[in-house]
Amino acid sequence: MKQSVIIVAGGKGLRMGSDLPKQFLPVGGKPVLMHTLEAFRKYDAMLQIILVLPREQQDFWKQLCEEHHFSVEHLVADGGETRFHSVKNGLALVQAPGLVGVHDGVRPFVTLEVIRRCYELAEQHKAVIPVVDVVETLRHLTDAGSETVSRTEYKLVQTPQVFEVELLKQAYGQEFTPFFTDDASVVEAMGVPVHLAEGNRENIKITTPFDLKIGSALL
C-alpha cells in the first residue's frame, strides 16, 4: 500500500522570542525540520514526503538545504491561513489509495517504532493517532474555581496521525471550524472513530527555548 506523509511547518517562532521560525532553529548542528524529514526517510526510503511551508519561507528553506547538503527528497506545498488549510494543500499532492500521515515539523524525535506502529495500525483501523499518558495532575476550571480530574481518563496526543487517504480527503472537504485542532478532530467530525497507538515520550513539540535545550540533550 502506498504511503505518504505531510509534514506541516508553519511556525513563526513567536514563543521562541526569535525572528527565525522555530522549524529552522538549529539542534545538533542543523535545523529542526531536517531532523524531522530524516526520521521519516529512515522509516521508508520510498515514502512520499510532502513538506508544507509558507510561501515566503520556501526560498530560505532551499538555501538551508544547499548549505547543509540536505538530500532527503521531498515535495513542497504552500502553507495556508491555518493548519487546517495547510494540511488540505498538502493533501492535494497525495493520490489515493494508500495511507497518509500528518506530522508536526517541529517534532523531530518521533521514533521509527512509533511511525511504523501508526502506519501498520492504520491499515486495519483507518484512523490512528499516537498518544502518551498524562503524568502531571490536571485541574478542570469551573465557574466556582477549579477541581481535580482523573488523569487516567486523558491522554496527550502526538503526531504522526495516520489515515486512509480517501478518508482524510473526505474529512478535509468539510468546512473549517476553530474546533479542528488536529487531524483526528477533523475526521471525528464525520463520526469516524480514531484508534489510539502508543507514542514515545521524547516526541516533544519544540515551541519554546526550554524545548530546544531538551532537544539538544536528546541528540
Curated annotation (Swiss-Prot):
Which superkingdom? Answer: Bacteria
What organism, scientifically named, is this protein from? Bacteroides thetaiotaomicron (strain ATCC 29148 / DSM 2079 / JCM 5827 / CCUG 10774 / NCTC 10582 / VPI-5482 / E50)
**Which sequence ranges are marked TM in the entry?**
none
Q: Name one Pfam family in it.
A: IspD
Q: What does this protein do?
A: Catalyzes the formation of 4-diphosphocytidyl-2-C-methyl-D-erythritol from CTP and 2-C-methyl-D-erythritol 4-phosphate (MEP).
SUPFAM superfamilies in alphabetical order:
Nucleotide-diphospho-sugar transferases
Kindly state which keywords UniProt assigns to this record, in alphabetical order: Isoprene biosynthesis, Nucleotidyltransferase, Transferase
Q: Which family does it belong to?
A: Belongs to the IspD/TarI cytidylyltransferase family. IspD subfamily.
Pathway assignment: Isoprenoid biosynthesis; isopentenyl diphosphate biosynthesis via DXP pathway; isopentenyl diphosphate from 1-deoxy-D-xylulose 5-phosphate: step 2/6
Does the keyword field hold Membrane? no
- What molecular function does GO assign, one term? 2-C-methyl-D-erythritol 4-phosphate cytidylyltransferase activity
Its top-level enzyme class, in one word, is transferase
Q: Report the InterPro entries cross-referenced here.
A: IspD (IPR001228), IspD/TarI (IPR034683), IspD/TarI_cytidylyltransf_bact (IPR050088), Nucleotide-diphossugar_trans (IPR029044)
One example of a Gene Ontology biological process annotation: isopentenyl diphosphate biosynthetic process, methylerythritol 4-phosphate pathway
List residue numbers at the site (Positions MEP for the nucleophilic attack): 151, 205
The protein, known as:
2-C-methyl-D-erythritol 4-phosphate cytidylyltransferase
Task: Enumerate the residues marked as the site Transition state stabilizer.
Answer: 15, 22
Which EC numbers characterise this protein's activity in its record? 2.7.7.60
Under catalytic activity, the entry for this protein gives: 2-C-methyl-D-erythritol 4-phosphate + CTP + H(+) = 4-CDP-2-C-methyl-D-erythritol + diphosphate
Q: Which gene encodes it?
A: ispD
